[in-house]
Amino acid sequence: MKLSDIKNGNLSAEWAEKGYELPKFDVEAVKAKTHAEPTWVHFGAGNIFRAFPAAILNEALNSGKYDRGVIVAESFDYEIIDKAYQPYDNLSLRVCLKSTGDIEKKVIASVTESLKADYSFGEDW
């Protein structure tokens, strides 16, 4: 199982069967609308961003209360873009261990684009 399979609709049933909450919105449509009409660029692509602000936006997209994702830009540690975002189509896996011992597993798909905030990376600038 690979995160990128979810985006293509492959193995979605297998992920759900194993207890992963998948995006309930059309990831590609949100990506296209965000690219055409961006509303949020977030500077700082670390774990706190992925686990909290991106997860909250993911819930808003799942509920239909919002229709665009977030573009994340990293201005310090560019390796996170190259190793944690782009190889996985900007998808993340959020895993929370609850006080009851339950494990909550969610695929976060609200990040639609990941960029290096540095003019030396012309394609991102």
Question: Residue spans of the language-model regions?
Answer:
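Non-transmembrane, aqueous-exposed alpha-helical and coiled segments at domain scale
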Residues: M1-W125
